[in-house]
Design a protein with these regions (language model features):
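Surface-exposed strand-loop-strand hairpins of Gram-negative outer-membrane beta-barrel proteins
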Residues: 7-48
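Outer-membrane beta-barrel porins/channels
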Residues: 18-31, 49-419
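Short secondary-structure capping/turn segments at boundaries of alpha-helices and beta-strands
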Residues: 1, 43-44, 53-56
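Glycine- and acidic-residue-biased ligand/ion/polar-headgroup-sensing regions
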Residues: 2-6
Length: 419
């Protein structure tokens, strides 16, 4: 089955061609801060379409035992903004995906009760791209007047110029093992009730690399931080020059620990009539131990910490199958789920909010053992405020001051083939 998770691409009118300043796209160091209520919506384009494969295989061993294997590659979230959007310092592009391999079994204990379990191997990947604004970082690291002082020293030939913007990229890889267990109760030949539980997934060994695009100006500024006047004046300004220079090294090893939520699910299936099936599902996911924090491997210094105070997600879904003809089945579904981040802590690279799911589809069965399914769905996400989170640390990577509204709506197609 080909399936799609939460996917969105925001206004993406940009070029990926780099320039001599080490930037992916046109220069944006123009002092733009944005205006309160500025709106960022998804824009269709070639890079907002993703192909996400999935595979499921079930093999009956005997009348009571079935073993199965599944694999999926899911984009948990894809966001991309223009280079010049005012919140670019907090992250203008993010790609989070988890590839999961499952091996499991189902066993029928009695005519009305079955149990099942699976083990999973999960591969984690995250990529974040931000625009590093040196002038903004300098103004936040030192007391008021620091940038003016450095500009004066530059005019006197005593310091290099404060560099313009450049791209910084963070790539993280990791893996984890997990398991899931469930049971299925069939009180009648028309009704099935299922429940399952999956514990938290702990990616404790995620590592990767922080890359800062370097040019002549950034190299000269990093050298200035390592010595010269900054060795004398830095302590007076409360700035540790050598430490700041180390934080700006072009290549640094990075690490992250992240916990994905546990999940409890209960579902109901009822064969109402020869033509109509009814379904309902409730899902509970506890995100309260999830956090976004990235550190340097060499010294443990924080690259970025994004406090978001994640909450519990409750999801409700209902659906039906209607069979107008022997070989054709129509599907319809609706779902709703609360967001896990409040307005005051929502960040651009994770603009999560309350959402609703709408889906329509059809299955055609040309032969007894073959079914082809096609579906269309809409994820309708409430527009959410971004840019209010003032708790991002260190302060120099908190991004420019901006207040905006992001809309994560997305559409997707699903194609399935069962043999």
């Amino acid at each position: 089955v080909l399936n799609v998770a939460s996917i969105a691409t925001f206004d993406n009118d940009y070029t990926s061609i780099g320039d001599e300043n080490g930037q992916d796209g046109p220069p944006t160091d123009d002092g733009r801060r944005g205006t309160s209520g500025e709106f960022f919506s998804r824009k269709d384009g070639y890079d907002s379409a993703l192909f996400i494969p999935g595979l499921f295989v079930a093999i009956p061993v005997n009348p009571k035992l079935v073993v199965g294997f599944s694999a999926s590659g899911s984009h948990g979230l894809l966001t991309r903004y223009r280079e010049d959007y005012p919140g670019r310092g907090s992250g203008r592009e993010s790609d989070l995906k988890v590839t999961r391999l499952n091996l499991g079994f189902g066993y029928k204990l009695t005519p009305t009760l079955s149990i099942g379990a699976n083990g999973s191997y999960e591969r984690y990947f995250q990529s974040i791209k931000i625009r590093l604004n040196y002038r903004d970082a300098v103004s936040k690291l030192g007391p008021p007047g620091t940038t003016a002082l450095l500009d004066t020293l530059n005019a006197s030939g005593l310091a290099p110029p404060i560099p313009g913007e450049t791209d910084a990229k963070l790539r993280i890889l990791g893996w984890a093992l997990n398991a899931q267990a469930g049971l299925l109760w069939e009180p009648t030949d028309r009704t099935r009730i299922g429940a399952s539980y999956r514990p938290k997934t702990r990616f404790n060994g995620n590592q990767g690399e922080l890359t800062i695009n370097e040019n002549a100006d950034t190299a000269a500024f990093r050298g200035f931080l390592n010595g010269g006047l900054i060795a004398i004046g830095g302590p007076l300004l409360g700035v540790n020059g050598p430490q700041a220079a180390g934080d700006l090294e072009p290549q640094q090893q990075a690490r992250q620990s992240v916990i994905f939520p546990d999940e409890f699910r209960i579902s109901l299936f009822h064969h109402y009539s020869p033509k109509l099936d009814l379904m309902a599902t409730y899902t509970y996911q506890d995100y309260t131990e999830t956090f976004l924090r990235y550190e340097r491997v060499s010294n443990g210094r924080v690259i970025e910490d994004l406090p978001q105070d994640f909450k519990v997600a409750h999801a409700y879904r209902i659906g039906l199958n209607y069979k107008p003809y022997k070989r054709l089945t129509l599907h319809a579904g609706y779902g709703m789920e609360n967001g896990v981040v409040d307005d005051d802590l929502r960040v651009p690279i994770l603009p999560d909010n309350d959402r609703r799911f709408y889906g329509l589809g059809a299955s055609y069965t040309p032969s007894r053992d073959t079914t082809v399914t096609l579906a269309f769905g809409i994820i309708d996400v409430d527009a959410g405020q971004v840019g209010n989170n003032t708790q991002v640390t260190p302060i120099e990577v908190s991004g420019g001051e901006f207040k905006g509204i992001a809309d994560l709506d997305a559409e997707f197609f699903s194609l399935g083939f069962t043999q």
